[in-house]
Amino acid sequence: EYKANREEAPDDLAPQFEYIRKSVEAFNLPSIELLNYEADDLIATYAKKITEAGAKVTVISSDKDLMQLVSNKVRLFDPMKSKVIGEKDVIEKFGVKPSQVIDVQSLAGDSSDNVPGVPGIGVKTAAELINKYKTLENLLKKASEIPQNKRRETLLSNKDKAMILSLIHISEPTRHRG
């Protein structure tokens, strides 16, 4: 279900992939392509391995899902806005720390990743709840204690929707060409 709404690459984009591959090869840059792995999952996996080795990482992307990777060792560069995105920027956009972005997206939903979210809960309310309860798991455990009747009932009856995460998967395969 996750990313089920993902469309195939547009007809005018797909032919460009081979040009990108050839350009990367011409510059003698290593490249990574693994069947059945999302690019953001590979990016997260490599970012983790690189930071564990003691280096800092800059990820070049405008994909907001990658904001959950931001830390004192990982930053994003959004080429569309020509802007470096650090922890403060993530907090400004989502109202929570980067490590909590996934919980906010799970509650508020994200149609581009087929994450339904909880009806009636947007990013602002999701951020308030996550800031108060610290994690989605803790919020759902304590949902019966929420004082607002409608919010409490909505959360209790939509726990399954809240648990559909847009979590980036960090996995072991890290083979590359180049």
Residue ranges and their predicted role:
Residues 1-60, 64-84, 161-167, 171, ...:
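Noncatalytic, basic helical substrate-engagement surface that gates or grips nucleic-acid strands
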